[in-house]
């Protein structure tokens, strides 16, 4: 048999041309099956390419080609190659595909909704629910978790501290008393239970208030709920608060109602009482009195606890067994509850204050208790009494300092043989200052405050008074603040002259309190009486050109009684006006208008221009400044010359030091082999 061997080099030579259309159909069927998603244009282009390939093979079937070339021109491979290329070129972007999918899904939904209206309603409800859930989630995420926060420096927080202090003090005083005096617990059990559980409710409410109490972080109040809770939990007080609300009352079921000492854990909330006392001390206007009363309360509580312990020890030893313990309760006189407590309180007071005069102890346990009481009395009461003494001395410190000043002035007047009338006037003036609380030096008190707070206090106190002056009514706020800080309070006695006619005016005055009289030269005849809010001397400190009175006083002003005035000096006003030139011109214009109304302005002199005296003063000032600059320049020049001389001396020293070294190096270079030695020395 003869076998036909197919030559792979000419794979299409022995194949008849009739087989090609069948292969093309087969390839087209594969293409249509694999690429049905392509458009009709793509299919048309593929068919054109396949026809071109047929003609190409018919014309070049007998030409020699390599395997790669034959492979490229095979009908099937060529078609698939072109399909892949066209799919890569015509591939749509992802966004367009997504849009097409959305459109298809919407169209499908519409078709389904037309068919099933119930499904449509269900889908709409589901969509609404999803939208609501998304909105709530977004709100929760966007919210900063801010809640109603209590400001720790506000009145609400302070009032709550007062509310929580009451149950704390109740527990600290009554639990120990009820535990030691059985009648007190059994006779009023219903009332104690009500008070106990009301205090427990207040304790629980206090824990909630703590989680809503803000704190300052970089000067800003923190209002984040989670931060507040985390800060409270991280604090030691949270653990104490939890321990203080543990329901130990359940032990009543086992031990009975006569054991109120099981509620001793309620005493752990004492820090709230201390906080209330501290805030009250800062708020009250009488801090020394409050401190003293606070210490007295501590003393009473210590004596109360010691009295209860004494009675319980007497009960343990046996009433009336010896002279030291409480007497026999079978005696009607000592069987009453009031007598039991008062007797124990009396014994505790005598013991802790180390006064004594109590029956001596008999048993060893009694001796130990008395020794402990004496130690407590010595340590605690010594500190408490010392604090009270220091507080009382602080309360009298101002009076003592004031009295020392008065005594020093009295000694001076006696030494200088001052008349008795003058001495009486001085003493009366000091008495007026003390009784009216005008001994405080405002500058000394406000010295420790920052400038901003000091200015605000001065504005609150003096700004309204300064605005009453006509020339300052329309001035800038900044200038008024500057002037307010420069006002000086002064007090004048009855009959004192504030100013006399013809005196040079260097100050203006504003009456804060009191009455002043404009009197004649005899000092008796009164023309006008000035009262609170009046002012005078404002024109003289402006030194307006053309004033007929110049800068001298035009009237005699005398104090009728004790008068409080504010004084503003000319130098302070001019210093403030240097930063406000527009305000200066406005004040001068107002002063001219006032003088024109009163007929005290010479218009010709006012319109003459600048005064030659002022020009001379300016020239002298300029000459002085030039002289100062010359002296400074000469000093700088002398310093420069001295520095230059020192630099020259240093350079000469360096030359002397380096000259022999350089000469030796150059001499070594001139010798044969010197260069190599020099390089070796440099390398070393």
Curated annotation (Swiss-Prot):
Keywords, ordered alphabetically: Calcium, Calcium channel, Calcium transport, cAMP, cAMP-binding, Cell membrane, cGMP, cGMP-binding, Coiled coil, Glycoprotein, Ion channel, Ion transport, Ligand-gated ion channel, Membrane, Nucleotide-binding, Sensory transduction, Sodium, Sodium channel, Sodium transport, Transmembrane, Transmembrane helix, Transport, Vision
Region of interest (Ion conduction pathway), residue spans: 287-395
Tissue-specificity statement: Rod cells in the retina and inner medulla of kidney.
Compositional bias annotation for Basic and acidic residues: 105-145
Membrane topology: Multi-pass membrane protein
Composition-biased stretches (Acidic residues): 39-54
GO biological process, one term: sodium ion transport
Segments for region (Disordered): 34-145
Family: Belongs to the cyclic nucleotide-gated cation channel (TC 1.A.1.5) family. CNGA1 subfamily.
Keyword Glycosyltransferase: no
Recorded catalytic activity of this chain's protein: Ca(2+)(in) = Ca(2+)(out); Na(+)(in) = Na(+)(out); K(+)(in) = K(+)(out); NH4(+)(in) = NH4(+)(out)
Signal peptide: none
Region of interest (C-linker), residue spans: 397-473
Subcellular location: Cell membrane
Ranges of the Extracellular topological domain: 184-193, 259-263, 314-336
Binding-site positions, 3',5'-cyclic AMP: 553-554
Protein name, entry field: Cyclic nucleotide-gated channel alpha-1
GO molecular function: calcium channel activity; cAMP binding; cGMP binding; intracellularly cAMP-activated cation channel activity; intracellularly cGMP-activated cation channel activity; sodium channel activity
Sequence intervals crossing the membrane: 162-183, 194-214, 240-258, 264-282, 290-313, 337-371, 372-396
Gene Ontology cellular component list: membrane; photoreceptor outer segment; photoreceptor outer segment membrane; rod photoreceptor outer segment
Coiled-coil blocks: 615-669
Glycosites: 321
Organism this protein belongs to: Mus musculus (Mouse)
